[in-house]
Amino acid sequence: MATAEVLNIGKKLYEGKTKEVYELLDSPGKVLLQSKDQITAGNAARKNHLEGKAAISNKITSCIFQLLQEAGIKTAFTRKCGETAFIAPQCEMIPIEWVCRRIATGSFLKRNPGVKEGYKFYPPKVELFFKDDANNDPQWSEEQLIAAKFCFAGLLIGQTEVDIMSHATQAIFEILEKSWLPQNCTLVDMKIEFGVDVTTKEIVLADVIDNDSWRLWPSGDRSQQKDKQSYRDLKEVTPEGLQMVKKNFEWVAERVELLLKSESQCRVVVLMGSTSDLGHCEKIKKACGNFGIPCELRVTSAHKGPDETLRIKAEYEGDGIPTVFVAVAGRSNGLGPVMSGNTAYPVISCPPLTPDWGVQDVWSSLRLPSGLGCSTVLSPEGSAQFAAQIFGLSNHLVWSKLRASILNTWISLKQADKKIRECNL
């Protein structure tokens, strides 16, 4: 029988409308976020006790943060702790709500007369609002945020930091939007917050993402909304109305775990012409692992054993798992073209070129007979990424890792540029 975890909880650091934050005396730099059985709307102008909401909110946040972390998004989340709390790195919160919208609805329509409900934003529209309950969280411009000269955990919030949060908001929305699609749910909009990790001094996604944080429409139908808007829309709060709201929240909590899995399988099979190319192939396998894609290595030569090459091909075609073949053959590459001419599956040639004959050898991968769709990628890591992009069309987990990688590359360049500029001062 499992025993309940005992934490050495210190003082209360913060209390909001729906959660409390406590220090953890035995874990410096970590805090406990405890959810409440409370639901609010209109900056708590409407407020009700909702039994079980804390557990529902905690489950949703824990699953969403796990999904984002596994994708590669920097997130203030360590692990779930019991039914109603989770442990996270301690952050100094930036008092801005970042809103990302795919579909125009709600307050956006009030602030932008003439825009019809249902208008779609490409790319998603990012807005920011200063957290100030007394003034109903006024909308801010990026310039206002920069002019405020906020400093949290020693980090001054300037143009670079604002750009990072803006780009991260869009990436996070797109990952969650893509993740809800297999459940036939449209993510209409969402709001998130960032903080500065007091230990690493990095900007990270923080606070919570639960059913209070977004609009979620099954089948893209507003009348089926399952988010907190169903509570806001109540003309009068009754026990029956609250029960309906709770059922909506439970519906989301039941499905959010499904976002951590994908019904679409995927696999990369690397065919090498010789074990002398094993090092090259292992780089491909390692890169596939970074995208969560299973990868198998096989040895076969299309020149010396074409019958065995085609038998291996048939083996993988026969089990029904979506597969991308990567052909690794030096000198004259017959492996990629032979595979491409005999399978409807994608084939990528990734020849291990050598300094002496590489310039000549590469033409066996580039100049092919008509009717072959074999692509050529020279980088082992690049061939794995290309395979991931193929699978990402139908697998939201792979796509999420690709999207987070794009964001993280952009952030690293932005931070490198900031560092260089500071050195020039």
From Swiss-Prot:
- Write down the SMART domains for this protein, in alphabetical order: AIRC
Task: Tell me the segments the record calls region Linker.
Answer: 261-266
- Which Enzyme Commission number(s) are on file for it? 4.1.1.21, 6.3.2.6
Q: Where is this region: SAICAR synthetase domain?
A: 2-260
Q: Which GO terms describe its cellular component?
A: cytoplasm; cytosol; extracellular exosome; membrane
List of residues that carry N-acetylalanine: A2
Its Gene Ontology molecular function terms? ATP binding; cadherin binding; identical protein binding; phosphoribosylaminoimidazole carboxylase activity; phosphoribosylaminoimidazolesuccinocarboxamide synthase activity
N6-acetyllysine is found on K36, K247
Per the record, a Pfam family?
SAICAR_synt
User: Part of which pathway?
Assistant: Purine metabolism; IMP biosynthesis via de novo pathway; 5-amino-1-(5-phospho-D-ribosyl)imidazole-4-carboxamide from 5-amino-1-(5-phospho-D-ribosyl)imidazole-4-carboxylate: step 1/2; Purine metabolism; IMP biosynthesis via de novo pathway; 5-amino-1-(5-phospho-D-ribosyl)imidazole-4-carboxylate from 5-amino-1-(5-phospho-D-ribosyl)imidazole (carboxylase route): step 1/1
Identify residues that carry Phosphotyrosine.
Answer: Y22
- Family membership, please give it: In the N-terminal section; belongs to the SAICAR synthetase family. In the C-terminal section; belongs to the AIR carboxylase family. Class II subfamily.
Show the HAMAP family listed in the entry: PurE_classII, SAICAR_synth
| Disease the record associates with this protein | Phosphoribosylaminoimidazole carboxylase deficiency: An autosomal recessive inborn error of purine metabolism, clinically characterized by multiple congenital anomalies and early neonatal death.
Q: What does this protein do?
A: Bifunctional phosphoribosylaminoimidazole carboxylase and phosphoribosylaminoimidazole succinocarboxamide synthetase catalyzing two reactions of the de novo purine biosynthetic pathway.
Q: What is this protein called?
A: Bifunctional phosphoribosylaminoimidazole carboxylase/phosphoribosylaminoimidazole succinocarboxamide synthetase
In its UniProt entry, the species of origin is given as: Homo sapiens (Human)
Q: Which gene encodes it?
A: PAICS
